[in-house]
């Protein structure tokens, strides 16, 4: 039902817009952190932090396999750049695909999203994000299993913190379980070159996000 409501919301947005298309060191964390059944321990939004990315209009989104999330974000008008990488793990030496896939580094497959707020808001990007993920799933999305596929939204400034907290609180109230990590970005390392723009290079490649949903958001303007 909620997805239907969101679809109607985006359809309304499209009509209104004329369907225009327009490092820091961190302590080692356990990748299998225990949580309450409602996922409450995943909220770290009130942590004291020193931001590592000084750009205002950047958000980091972990939404399962980064191929699909990168492609989704790139399809949204107003997104300047989307880069696949590994976030909030142990150290740079562990930030490679083979090591991360072992599930022992704490790294999440994450997409760094830089956007133009004159064309698209952070609210809109987060709405698109929550539309395509399953927030009730821990350490998995689609057919992918492992701590590297844990969902999360990682902010880099105070303004984004408040927006993320507000949207996350709304989403948290929609189900009994909510396992999306909410907190500051601690580190981020770009993924290997062959992961960048993977679905653009391999149009028939695996993606846990339906193509129809990407097409929907390619006409998004808020």
Per-segment meaning from a language model:
Residues 2, 19-222:
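Flexible coil/turn and secondary-structure edge motifs
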Residues 7-17:
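Bacterial N-terminal signal peptides
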């Amino acid at each position: 039902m909620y997805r239907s409501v969101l679809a109607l919301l985006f359809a309304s947005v499209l009509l209104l817009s004329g369907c225009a298309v327009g490092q820091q060191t961190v302590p080692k964390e356990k990748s299998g952190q225990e949580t309450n059944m409602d996922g409450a321990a995943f909220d770290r939004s009130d942590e004291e932090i020193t931001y590592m990315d000084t750009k205002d209009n950047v958000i980091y989104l972990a939404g399962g396999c980064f191929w699909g999330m990168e492609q989704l974000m790139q399809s949204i008008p107003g997104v300047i750049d989307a880069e696949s990488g590994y976030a909030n793990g142990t150290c740079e030496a562990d930030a490679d695909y083979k090591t991360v896939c072992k599930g022992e580094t704490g790294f999440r497959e994450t997409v760094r999203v830089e956007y133009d707020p004159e064309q698209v808001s952070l609210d809109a990007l987060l709405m698109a994000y929550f539309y395509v993920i399953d927030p009730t799933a821990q350490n998995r999305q689609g057919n992918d299993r492992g701590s590297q596929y844990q969902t999360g939204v990682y902010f880099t400034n105070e303004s984004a913190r408040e927006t993320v907290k507000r949207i996350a609180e709304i989403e948290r109230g929609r189900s009994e379980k909510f396992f999306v990590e909410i907190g500051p970005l601690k580190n981020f390392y770009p993924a290997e070159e062959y992961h960048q723009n993977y679905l653009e290079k391999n149009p028939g490649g695996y993606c846990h996000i339906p193509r129809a949903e990407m097409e929907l958001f390619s006409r998004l303007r808020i």
